Amino acid sequence: MAEVFDVVVIGAGPAGYVCAIRAAQLGLKTACVENGSYEGGLGGTCLNWGCIPAKALLESAALAETLKSHGDEMGVRPVEVEYDMGAAVDRSRFISEKLTKGIGFLFKKNEVEHVVGTGRITAPGKVEVTPDEGDPQTLEAKNIVIATGAVMKSFPGFEIDGEKVIGSREALALRSPPERMVVVGAGYVGVEFADVFNAFGVEVTLVEALDSVVPLADAEIGKTLARSFKKRGMTIRTGTKVKSLDRDSSPMILTVETDKGEETIETDVVLMAVGRSPMTEGLGLDAVGVEMNGPWVKIDEWCASSVPGIYAIGDVAGEPMLAHKGSHEGIVAAEKIAGVAEHPMRYDNIPSVGYCHPEVATIGMTEEEAAEAGYEVKVGKYPLTAHGRALTAAHNEGFVKIVADAKYGEVL
């Protein structure tokens, strides 16, 4: 007879492992299914091949950039800054592995059963787990939580081959930086990688189809960041769409389209940073009648799907596709299942951060969104050029901006 769990979580990324641990803390018998061969296992993309190793490389980049740009004025005069991308990558991998082991420890401490394999819902309350080797097993669950995350997107003609066209995973393991790189997509992932490789001496061109870098942020942020990147020697191509790539030429020839027509860019590597797609294929959602919201699982404010006893959290449950949002959804879902939930999800006040240099952090409405929503907008702004700590750290580019409703004074 199959073992019966109160909760089976499919996926052990920031949403899944947090949900599993919280459910176990609330006294629920919990299992978490994760295929160890996918994205390194516990911790998912974020800990293994996303947020954490990227931030480690960004710290290396920040140190290199500070020495180059501000060393003399700060009284530190290295004869020459030498780059060792391999050492930076090794450090990032060590940090990821340490944190992944920490999740394993938390699973043991809280008595979460880690089931290694690929999970699929075969019927309400039943999850089939197929390991890389061996026979499948079936877990019976009173509640199932889908936390399978997302995978990198690409375009036809720009399929990731791991060498000439790479995604974020390959970029995080790149031990020898190329001479030239085109980063396609100037969202937070794109600008972070542009920052890293520029700091390590790569000639970086950042290509974005929309009219601004970090196009979902306040327009002023995009202008300030683009200006800073240009000062550091990066080429910024906004309002530019990629059309084709000649991989056989050396260097490769990337053809792009602007409002002035087609142009070409020479490059050694193309890094695709055009977003991620929720991973729902092979989960068996159609068979059990789970309703979808476009490519995502449709959920309510308690992270419940259209099928009783099935929940969805994290990237698979919709935007914003952010680790901390997924973690909070995991807590909400676990507490709802345990019958102790007090606060449903709110999606209007989730912070978003880009750890490039200068760093970008936003929460709430942009000035443009507030105006479009019909508010009488009032803006307060403070330049970091007047901020003591920013000046002492030589990080005084940028500003703090508050968008408010002029009528009632509400911060938007």
Question: What do these predicted regions represent?
Answer:
Residues 1-17, 25, 218-220, 231, ...:
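Mid-to-C-terminal Rossmann-like scaffold of FAD/NAD(P)H-dependent oxidoreductases
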Residues 6-32, 190-199:
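N-terminal Rossmann-like FAD-binding beta1-loop-alpha1 element of flavoenzymes
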Residues 9, 182-183:
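Hydrophobic Val/Ile/Leu positions in short beta-strands of Rossmann-like dinucleotide-binding domains
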